[in-house]
Regions:
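Alpha-helical transmembrane segments of multi-pass membrane proteins
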Residues: 1-228
Length: 228
């Protein structure tokens, strides 16, 4: 049950990251339909690349590899929106800014594509042929993410606080991978605990950023208006 809850939340976080990027691109470059279409298209294609990459390069431990993926997703997702505003405020031309934003979409998509096979592998250690249940929970989590983003996160918090909030949630899930440490080999636990400490540090930083999210949002808005 705990693993299914983690699957749900991870899918929720990943789709919200992409929607945040789609909305940010719309704010900077206009043409909302185009931005969202390209964002979702790149996301789906990148998920496929992530799954294929994982097939080519199997890790010794799926739990260990998943912890690395969650750390990267937390960093990329949490910093994506603010990073775009900062680069724009620094005077980065439109084309490089657009390339960077779409690169983030691809990176988050690849990492998300790696999540699903790793989660299936972890689940299969307890019960065979559980792919359908993992995929089902993953899809429902993504659907929930689209609804919560559209009807609550974005209208209530805006872009920057939403990014911090979702990445904080992602970091919490990364910490909860501690519940799966029994599936680690004896030689892998040291590295896992090191990664867990890094995840805890990220969690603390994100909590601080969320606390100061309103001030950071105002700074981003000033940068945006100043460059317009």
């Amino acid at each position: 049950l705990i693993l299914y809850a983690l699957i749900f939340v991870l899918a929720f976080c990943s789709i919200v990251y992409e929607l945040l990027l789609g909305q940010t691109l719309s704010a900077f470059f206009g043409n909302t339909v185009l931005r969202y279409s390209v964002t979702i298209g790149l996301y789906m294609a990148s998920m496929g690349l992530g799954a294929l990459y994982l097939q080519w390069r199997r890790a010794r431990s799926s739990v260990l590899r998943l912890q690395v993926v969650e750390i990267l997703l937390t960093v990329c997702g949490g910093g994506s929106v603010v990073g775009i505003f900062l680069l724009d405020g620094a005077g980065l031309p439109t084309l490089p800014l657009s390339i960077w934003a779409h690169f983030l979409i691809i990176v988050i998509g690849v990492l998300t594509g790696m999540e699903i096979p790793l989660l299936i592998e972890i689940r299969n250690r307890d019960r065979r042929s559980s792919e359908t249940s993992v995929l089902g929970v993953d899809y429902i989590g993504a659907f929930a993410g689209t609804l919560v983003f559209a009807f609550y996160f974005y209208p209530t918090f805006g872009l920057v606080p939403s990014a911090f909030l979702v990445s904080l949630l992602n970091a919490v899930v990364g910490m909860l991978l501690l519940t799966q440490r029994g599936k680690l080999g004896s030689g892998e636990r040291g590295r896992f605990h090191t990664l867990l400490a890094g995840q805890a540090l990220l969690l603390a930083v994100l909590a601080l950023l969320l606390w100061r999210a309103d001030a950071i949002s105002e700074m981003c808005l000033s940068l945006y208006l100043g460059s317009s």
